[in-house]
Amino acid sequence: MYIKNNHSIRWKIQYVPTYYEGLNEDQERDQRIVLNFKDGNYNDDLMLWFRQNIWKLTEGDEYSWSVCFLPCSSDEEQQKRFGKLEQYLKENTRIEIHLSTFGYVEKQEPSHYIGKSDIDLMNIALHVPDVYMKNVILIDDIITTGETFNRTAEQAMRMGANSIHGLFLAKTIHPDLPMKEKNSHREDDDSIIREEAEIMNKLSNLPPEDN
């Protein structure tokens, strides 16, 4: 877990990107968990982890909090990835749950295609009542550089949020492993990896949250 001022970040597992090869069994398992999550395929145990960490953050004071989801590249992707988790949290907590607080004004390519630094804050629309005077929990699948989280959190704070806290399934790591041949979506893998590692090291050097 990483905490700074009125922000905090928690994650469950570590994610090794698919452009690495030679992963061990644990790394392969966690990679599958993340990729399945992206497709909306996850079990009750994983949803329970999010619920338990929401409880830890709110300390039982659920009424001054709001749970939102970081935006996917389209409404369809948002529903596919987070729809089941949204419904579970609505049924099992008393906190406000908002699937579509944030969205892109114009269609956005997935951030791992365009590069994290190219995300346009002005392209993110925000439903202000979901965050105004609230302690906001932002949920997403992976935190890599923290760019999307930080920019979205900045916008929410400008619109009156009291604090911002991130809950992520996984944190991206870059182990000392060989890389596969470059694919069409990552033309400059080496520089992106160096940038991701540098930013993430500044963000946090702590281990993943206990399961």
Which functions belong to the PLM regions below?
Residues 1-66, 75, 102-132:
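Active-site-facing substrate-recognition patch
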Residues 93-105:
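A short coil-to-beta-strand element that immediately follows conserved catalytic motifs
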